[in-house]
């Protein structure tokens, strides 16, 4: 009888604990299967939350990249407008040409600053060398960059880093500076050798000249020495081609951002689903538990009353 009383009391205590905590069990021995499921659900949530943090960091990185590319586009647009004015003769007086040259030089400096843009202290266009700026103050490359994989050398891979945003799912985050600024060869006098198709894919060596910077240098030199119509027209075409390249790269970044946005939504939905499963596995139904407590209390009180009647002492037993 005492055993049954204790069992009823333990049942009541367990139910009262569940109501107080809102959880079905407090130690694995209460529900080994449920505890095992909860452990798995918590592990899944931790992984998904890490994927979510990775996706958010990747999105922030690419947002800054997209913003920098947009800024480069604005620089090229302004340079194009100035060059068109010179080509049309709108600005042909020496003092006007000098003002155009000064603005072109300032735009060139701004390009260098954009090329060295950072996100959270990391240079976004510098490949693996995020602790180093892409460009030197003179406009040359400050670092070496591997732009593409070498099929003959397994260790030589493009300096693209990826974030894990799911099981076996990654997203390429960075944009290599060579893809935006390109590179150009120099002659024996150190003058750029312009070709029909700019090079945006070859590996970059430190101190090499970016194509985009060379375009501004050539235009500035021409404005300083005279305005040869052929050279001005060539500068217009180079600015147009450079702008198209920047737009193409910006479009790639935008496509990755769109995909990443969908991935973030998917991860959020997965976290909600697992949280629902975890809640179903762990959390008690308050209405149901209140009813069970009321029933357990009645059972316990009834057992106490029954026990009291069974072991009720007689007057003789009480006196002795």
What kind of region is each of these model predictions?
Residues 1-131, 221-320:
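Amphipathic alpha-helical polymerization modules
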């Amino acid at each position: 009888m005492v055993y049954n009383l204790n069992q009823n009391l333990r049942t009541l205590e367990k139910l009262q604990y569940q109501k107080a905590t809102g959880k079905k069990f407090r130690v694995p021995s209460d529900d080994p299967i449920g505890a095992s499921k909860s452990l798995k659900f918590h592990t899944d949530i931790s992984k998904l939350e890490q994927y979510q943090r990775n996706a958010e960091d990747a999105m922030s990185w690419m947002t800054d990249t997209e913003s920098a590319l947009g800024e480069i586009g604005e620089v090229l647009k302004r340079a194009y407008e100035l060059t068109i004015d010179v080509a049309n003769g709108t600005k042909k007086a020496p003092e006007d040409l000098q003002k155009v040259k000064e603005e072109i030089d300032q735009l060139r400096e701004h390009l260098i600053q954009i090329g060295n843009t950072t996100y959270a202290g990391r240079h976004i266009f510098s490949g693996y060398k995020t602790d180093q700026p892409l460009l030197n103050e003179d406009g040359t490359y400050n670092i070496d960059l591997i732009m593409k994989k070498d099929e003959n050398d397994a260790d030589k891979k493009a300096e693209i880093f990826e974030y894990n945003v799911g099981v076996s799912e990654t997203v390429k985050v960075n944009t290599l500076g060579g893809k935006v600024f390109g590179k150009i060869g120099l002659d024996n006098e150190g003058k750029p050798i312009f070709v029909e198709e700019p090079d945006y894919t070859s590996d970059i060596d430190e101190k090499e000249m970016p194509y985009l910077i060379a375009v501004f240098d050539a235009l500035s030199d021409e404005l300083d020495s005279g305005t040869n119509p052929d050279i001005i027209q060539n500068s217009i075409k180079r600015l147009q081609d450079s702008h198209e390249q920047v737009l193409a790269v910006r479009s790639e970044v935008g496509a990755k951002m769109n995909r990443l946005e969908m991935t973030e939504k998917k991860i959020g939905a997965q976290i909600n689903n697992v949280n629902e499963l975890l809640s179903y596995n762990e959390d008690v139904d308050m209405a149901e538990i209140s009813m069970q407590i009321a029933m357990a209390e009645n059972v316990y009180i009834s057992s106490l009353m029954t026990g009291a009647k069974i072991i009720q002492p007689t007057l003789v037993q009480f006196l002795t």
